[in-house]
């Protein structure tokens, strides 16, 4: 009966005297008989399996007996409540005066539902071999495996598949760094595998536009110093202080490469950090030196400073690109990152080390170019004209060369 019961009636009783369990059961049968009619007679309900056995627990102390009654019911709510109220009509148990009061009527199904929920929580926390994987996680895992499979070597050193064909190269410390950059779509990275720079990579840095992307620690400083001596660096990007390139998120990688500095202006991170270290062995930092006045730039940097102070305007870029069948990738300051044939602009945007802020192209802006630009985070696309777009992302602004030149 307990397996099919819908409700459990719980009642408490107090008896002015010492009674046994059988006295309580007999009182429940005898004093409710005929009270509710034949349809709710306890013996008949038990015979038809609509009511379970009457379970009684009883204790005696100080000349009084007290305990509780539990009855399982598969009747409906109204009939169960009526039967429970009938139990309170019991006034005597055995030869003694008694008081019976229904404490509660428990919905067994609700209790089972609570058990199911609690068990489901437990299983969710402990029974699965792996955490829940959503669709984005699955796609990222597949992309990562494909990109890791794409890892090649350059003269025996780990490299992305585009190192030979690209006109720019990103030099990193180890294989794990190459894998991380591949995962984020950067396919022209090559690893030096230590602080001793291989001759092949030193030569590569002289042949291509070279960016060193190094860890934010003393090891990165050592590699940077040696690259500056045996190779030819154009730019330097660093992981945040104390962090490794292989552990960086996509956002941090993009930010570091976008904010790369000219190699001539790059300062070692460890040196910068140690400037505030104590000079006497104490824990108190040494005073920060006053910055040198910048009223007298060195003669060697005059040309660079002038160029940096006055980059071409967007209109000038648009006029320069018009009728040339070329494309320019520009950063936030409208400085040129790269110039490629217009036919290669989609691949150039997709594979750019540093995500361009603006792309100016002497060609029609197609849906494919717009999709790739929006995916990479390009803010503005400027072209000779535009296709009819099926969808146009709000984050990427589309204009024509004529608009930009005015």
Curated annotation (Swiss-Prot):
RNA polymerase that catalyzes the synthesis of short RNA molecules used as primers for DNA polymerase during DNA replication. CDD domains: TOPRIM_primases. Forms a ternary complex with MCM helicase and DNA. PROSITE patterns: TOPRIM. GO terms for cellular component: cytoplasm; DNA-directed RNA polymerase complex; exosome (RNase complex); primosome complex. Mg(2+) 1 binds at residues 173, 215. It catalyses: ssDNA + n NTP = ssDNA/pppN(pN)n-1 hybrid + (n-1) diphosphate. Mg(2+) 2 binds at residues 215, 217. Its EC number is 2.7.7.101. This is DNA primase DnaG. Residues 261-272 have a biased composition (Low complexity). Its cofactor is Mg(2+). GO terms for biological process: DNA replication, synthesis of primer. Signal peptide: none annotated. Belongs to the archaeal DnaG primase family. It holds the Pfam family Toprim_4. One of its GO terms (molecular function) is DNA-directed RNA polymerase activity. Residues 259-309 are annotated as: Disordered. It is an enzyme of class 2 (transferase). InterPro entries: DnaG_primase (IPR050219), Primase_DnaG_arc (IPR020607), TOPRIM_DnaG/twinkle (IPR034154), TOPRIM_dom (IPR006171).
């Amino acid at each position: 009966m307990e397996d099919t019961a819908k409700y459990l009636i719980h009642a408490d009783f107090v008896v002015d005297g010492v009674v046994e369990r059988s006295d309580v059961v007999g009182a429940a049968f005898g004093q409710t008989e005929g009270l509710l009619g034949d349809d709710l007679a306890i013996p008949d309900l038990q015979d038809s399996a609509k009511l379970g056995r009457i379970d009684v627990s009883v204790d005696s102390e100080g000349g009084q007996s007290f305990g509780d009654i539990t009855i399982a019911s598969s009747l409906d709510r109204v009939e169960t409540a009526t039967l429970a109220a009938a139990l309170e009509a019991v006034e005597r148990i055995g030869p003694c005066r008694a008081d019976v009061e229904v404490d509660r009527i428990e919905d067994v199904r609700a209790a089972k539902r609570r058990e199911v929920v609690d068990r489901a929580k437990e299983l969710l926390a402990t029974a699965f071999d792996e955490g829940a994987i959503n669709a984005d996680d699955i796609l990222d895992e597949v992309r990562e495996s494909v990109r890791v499979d794409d890892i090649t070597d350059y003269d025996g050193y780990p490299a992305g598949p585009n190192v030979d064909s690209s006109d720019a190269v990103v030099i990193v410390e180890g294989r794990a760094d190459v894998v991380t950059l591949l995962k984020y779509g950067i396919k022209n990275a090559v690893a030096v595998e230590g602080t001793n720079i291989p001759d092949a990579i030193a030569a590569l840095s002289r042949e291509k536009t070279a960016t060193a992307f190094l860890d934010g620690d003393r090891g990165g400083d050592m590699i940077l110093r040696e690259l500056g001596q045996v190779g030819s660096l154009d730019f330097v990007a660093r992981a945040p202080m104390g962090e490794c390139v292989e552990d960086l998120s996509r956002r941090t990688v993009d930010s570091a490469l976008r904010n790369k500095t000219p190699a001539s202006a790059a300062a070692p991170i460890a040196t910068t950090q140690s400037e505030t270290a104590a000079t006497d062995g104490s824990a108190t930092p040494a005073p920060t030196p006053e910055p040198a006045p910048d009223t007298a730039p060195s003669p060697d940097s005059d040309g660079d400073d002038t160029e940096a102070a006055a980059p071409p305007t967007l209109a000038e870029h648009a006029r320069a690109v018009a009728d040339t069948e070329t494309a320019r990738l520009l950063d936030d300051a409208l400085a040129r990152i790269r110039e490629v044939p217009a036919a290669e602009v989609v691949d150039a945007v997709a594979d750019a080390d540093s995500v361009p802020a603006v792309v100016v192209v002497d060609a029609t802006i197609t849906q494919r170019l717009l999709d790739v630009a929006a995916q990479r985070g390009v803010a503005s696309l400027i072209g000779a004209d535009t296709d009819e777009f099926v969808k146009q992302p709000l984050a990427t602004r589309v204009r024509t060369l004529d608009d930009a030149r005015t």
